Structures are given as structure tokens and as C-alpha cells.
UniProtKB/Swiss-Prot annotation:
It comes from the Eukaryota. It is found in: Cytoplasm. It comes from Schizosaccharomyces pombe (strain 972 / ATCC 24843). This is Queuine tRNA-ribosyltransferase accessory subunit 2. Belongs to the queuine tRNA-ribosyltransferase family. QTRT2 subfamily.
């Protein structure tokens, strides 16, 4: 999977990566899944898009660790998530945006499943990889959810090397060695701490079977012999501009959560790349449209002008807003269909811009023309599950109540007085009650 690239002056590069029998043109994005499925989309809808690969976080499916159905039932990961046979999958220990968890140990990391916090050992993770047979895999890694201390940093690197070595040895002993490619997890640490990783690539013969590098945040300076490997980023992106900046630093593959986050919020993505010519009014353009907004109640335009996705070809903004107001599930389906298509077109434009040698200039124009963040949503998205919410601190209520009291202020006051009167009567009854005397026999 070595990458042969055409680069821009900043470091952005365009190439192709072969995964099994599929050629992935980079830069590209892998679509994150939730509990093994693409949110809001059925498998037949997913097949309509040319999605390079699906990202599956194993912690989504390990409610009972080794007794979880994903490990006890027959079949590979393709059968579990009902993905097409030609659709590559990337298996990783955690979700793209994992919830905070306790620090890892020498042989395990802590994960957050639908049934609570669990310890995922490297032995169990290797067993899952050998059973599920994904095309791509990120080994178990100690990625802290808060800044690590000085003593922990060397341990993070040591665990990455040891756990990756154990996975490679297990793959080598089976037929999966030629079908499952490994992305080495590079910790987000200063280069001085990464020396053991660089030594691993220089001295260990197993390093020849590393297919790429996975970064959780910043891209560290790399030795010359590692520059040709594909680079994947799992960091959290808040805007498309952050993605463009990341590609400028040399990242080839992005795993963005913002597609589903925008859909959940009821936002239709409307940005494009390369960007359009600057508005004569000198005002910045929105990255998306909040479809809860009342201004779309009678708007008979498609979600995005010129878009040819299934949603924009058949439906209008007013209809999508009506579905959102009615809390119809199809509202989020239509938005997700459009947003995935918009992201696919976004990356097609990125590759074309790099090939033409205009990428850095187009990024500068994009920053000038578009707003830096998505519009605030005025509605409620689908109800969230416990494993989607940060429960480590006191957080605002994520799921609004399904009903509210219709009592007037006067009715509430009368009800409160009535409850207070009942409490007073119970106290008086208790005080008047005398326990029978006990007589000695």
C-alpha cells in the first residue's frame, strides 16, 4: 500500500491506494459507523455511494466482551454490518470520538460500551480481528482522552509497539496476513518520544507488513523511509476548513464525524471545493443550512443549488423542513443522503485542485469566502444513547422531555398547596399515634 503521490508545495498529495480489489483515490474519507451501521442509511442506500471504506469501532459491539454476539456468531465483519462484499472496512478498538475513560494498563485499554465501561485486552482484540477479517485494522493503542503526564508518555509508545507486534505475529500465523492490512497507531506526542517507533520500522522485519500510519491528532515529522506510507487521521474535525488544513499537512485519509453530526442537527451541507467566486456583497457564505429555520417553510428550492443527489433531485427545502417538524425519520434519511453526497463531491474537488496545482490558493479562498463554523441548530435531533454522551461530568440534558405540563400557573400553585397540605396531615397523624405499651409477663 505504499503511496506514490503528486504533491502541492504545502504537503497535500494525491495518489491511489489499493485495498483488496478496490482502488481508493486519495485524499479520501472513510465513513464512520455507529454500532456497525451508517447512521440513518440502510445498506442499499450505502451501496449507491462510492464510499472508499467504512470505519467500525469495535467498542460499539462489545457489550459483553468475549460473549458479545459479534464474536459468538458465525461470519466476518461484512456479514455483521451487512456491507457489500466489495466494500472495504477499517476495524479500530474505539469510536472516532471516544468518550473519556480510565487510563490503560499494560495489557488492556478501557472502552465505553452500551452496557458500561469494560476492559479490552490485546488478546481479545486480536481474537476479534482474526474472526472478523477486516481489510484494514488499527492495532490496540493507548490513546489518552486527556493530556498525558511525563511518566505515561513513554508507556504509550511502548504499548503501541508491543501490541502492534503481537497483532502482526498473530496475523502471520494465519491466512489473514495477506488479506488484513495494518495501520500503525502513531501517538500524538513530541518526536523525541517516538524514537522506539522509528526503531521498530528500521529493525523489525514485521514492519514491512505495515500498510499505513494512523494519527489521532497532529502529524509528526517522519523519517524519509516512512514518508511514502498512507496517512490516516482520526482526529475530531469541527469544520471543513480544518480538514483542508489537515490535508495540507500531508494526511491522505480522513474519518469525519461531522457528516452525521450535521444530519442529526438538521443541517444540510452546502459548501463546495474549489470555492465559488467571492460574493459582491463581501459577506461570508454559510457552510450549511439549518433546515429547522422557518424561512424554509415555503422554500421550493433544492437543499443545494446544482446538487444532483437523490434528495435534491426529488424533494424541496420546505418538504424536508416539514418532515423535521413532524419528527419523521425520513427527514434525517434525506439529509444524510445529501450530506454524504456533498462530502463525496468535496473530496473530488480536493483531488482535482491538487492535480491542477491550485490547492493552497483554493484553501486560502475557501477560508475567505466561507464561515468558520456550521449554523446553530434550532431543533432537536434523534434521541441520544448513553454511550453517545459524556457522563464523566455534569452535562446539560441531551434528550428533551417528550411532553410538558399544560397546567396554568394558578393550577400549579393550587396543586403545590394541596401536596403541602397532605404532607402536613401525615405529620400530624404520626404525632398523634402512641405506640402500645409493652407489659412484662
Amino acid at each position: 500500500m505504499a503511496i506514490s503521490s503528486l504533491s502541492s508545495p504545502s504537503g497535500a498529495r494525491v495518489s491511489s491506494v489499493t485495498v483488496k480489489n478496490k482502488v481508493l483515490k486519495t485524499p479520501c474519507f472513510f465513513l464512520p459507523t455507529s454500532r456497525g451501521t451508517v447512521p440513518h442509511l440502510t445498506p442499499d442506500n450505502v451501496e449507491e455511494f462510492d464510499i472508499p471504506a467504512l470505519y467500525v469501532g469495535l467498542e460499539d459491539c462489545l457489550d459483553r466482551l468475549e460473549a458479545s454476539p459479534i464474536l459468538t456468531n458465525e461470519g466476518t465483519i461484512k456479514k455483521w454490518i451487512a456491507a457489500p462484499s466489495v466494500q472495504p472496512t477499517l476495524l479500530a478498538p474505539r469510536r472516532t470520538s471516544p468518550l473519556p475513560s480510565v487510563s490503560a494498563g499494560q495489557s488492556h485499554i478501557n472502552i465505553v460500551t452500551a452496557s458500561g465501561a469494560k476492559k479490552l485486552t490485546n488478546d481479545l482484540y486480536i481474537k476479534a480481528v482474526l474472526k472478523l477479517c477486516p481489510e484494514l485494522v488499527i492495532p490496540l493503542n493507548d490513546t489518552p482522552t486527556s493530556p498525558p503526564g511525563v511518566k505515561r508518555k513513554p508507556k504509550i509508545v511502548e504499548r503501541s509497539v508491543n501490541w502492534t507486534t503481537e497483532l502482526l505475529l498473530a496475523l502471520k500465523a494465519t491466512d489473514a496476513f495477506n488479506t488484513t492490512k495494518v495501520f500503525f497507531p502513531v501517538p500524538d506526542l513530541d518526536t523525541q518520544y517516538l524514537t522506539p517507533i522509528f526503531q521498530f520500522f528500521q529493525e523489525n522485519q514485521l514492519a514491512n507488513n505495515i500498510a499505513g500510519l494512523a494519527f489521532s491528532n497532529n502529524v509528526n515529522p517522519l523519517p524519509a523511509d516512512l514518508v511514502g506510507l498512507p496517512r490516516l487521521s482520526i482526529q475530531k474535525f469541527e469544520s471543513p476548513l480544518e480538514i483542508l488544513k489537515c490535508i495540507q499537512r500531508g494526511i491522505d485519509i480522513i474519518v469525519p464525524d461531522m457528516i452525521t453530526q450535521a444530519t442529526d442537527a438538521g443541517v444540510a451541507l452546502t459548501f463546495s471545493f474549489p470555492p465559488p467566486s467571492k460574493d459582491v456583497l463581501n459577506s461570508k457564505i454559510e457552510l450549511g443550512l439549518d433546515m429547522w429555520d422557518e424561512r424554509f417553510a415555503t422554500d421550493m428550492e433544492p437543499l443545494q443549488s446544482g446538487c444532483v443527489c437523490k434528495t435534491c433531485r426529488r424533494y424541496k427545502r420546505a418538504y424536508v423542513r416539514h418532515l423535521l417538524q413532524a419528527r419523521e425519520l425520513v427527514a434525517w434519511i434525506l439529509l444524510q443522503l445529501h450530506n454524504v453526497y456533498a462530502f463525496t463531491a468535496f473530496f473530488q474537488g480536493i483531488r482535482a485542485s491538487i492535480q491542477e496545482g491550485n490547492f493552497d490558493e483554493d484553501v486560502r479562498k475557501f477560508e475567505e469566502i466561507y464561515m468558520t463554523s456550521f449554523p446553530a441548530s434550532h431543533g432537536f435531533g434523534p434521541r441520544k444513547r448513553g454511550y453517545q454522551m459524556d457522563l464523566t461530568n455534569v452535562q446539560p440534558v441531551e434528550n428533551k422531555p417528550a411532553w410538558i405540563s399544560m397546567k396554568s400557573p394558578l393550577e400549579k400553585e393550587i396543586a403545590n398547596e394541596y401536596e403541602a397540605l397532605k404532607v402536613t396531615e401525615r405529620k400530624e397523624d404520626t404525632q398523634d399515634y402512641n405506640e402500645p405499651e409493652l407489659h412484662n409477663r
